[in-house]
């Protein structure tokens, strides 16, 4: 470009007006540069085309995904020929489907979808994840509003109160050391029948302790009265 401008300046005669025209060669270079710039912008704007699957194609893809998450090249080729898709599109679909499956599995393991596990079939979520096993037993009964854990907690609280009362009546001196030294609390994993039996046993212990305390008190009063009578008889009153 500098050479062309220099040639134009040298060809100009002294005293003549300044040249305003550009040489044809310089015009061609400018047009070529502009064309390359437009071509680069066109390449940048190009995006990958998205494939719109039909319902039949999706059903076939999901059916094969239920059988295996990693189909081999022969299975992909056969499926692509049957569905009229390219093998690359089938492979990309399986990659996206596996990523979606892993995301659902992570949500299930985190407990996000435990309550809504029925929305996903076990084979669709993953063949190696049993969704039914993740559901709690009490979720099968929609009319039950109380969970087994709440039953165990309630029984444990009742048993704990009974144990505290029994321990206080049996030996007040050991109350400062805590009732669990004498009656350790049962774990939450015990069945409800065991907790109920332990609660009834503790209640019977409380009743026996109260009865023993009353009997001891009555016998002490009777002994005091008998001693008073003997003392009065000895003094001749």
Swiss-Prot record:
Region called Disordered, residue ranges: 1-50
GO molecular function: DNA-binding transcription factor activity, RNA polymerase II-specific; sequence-specific DNA binding; sequence-specific double-stranded DNA binding
Main location: nucleus
Keywords: Developmental protein, DNA-binding, Homeobox, Nucleus
BP-aspect Gene Ontology terms: cardiac atrium morphogenesis; cardiac pacemaker cell differentiation; cardiac right atrium morphogenesis; cartilage development involved in endochondral bone morphogenesis; chondrocyte development; chondrocyte differentiation; embryonic digestive tract morphogenesis; embryonic forelimb morphogenesis
Coiled-coil regions listed: none
Task of the protein: May be a growth regulator and have a role in specifying neural systems involved in processing somatosensory information, as well as in face and body structure formation.
Name this polypeptide is given: Short stature homeobox protein 2
Organism, scientific name: Rattus norvegicus
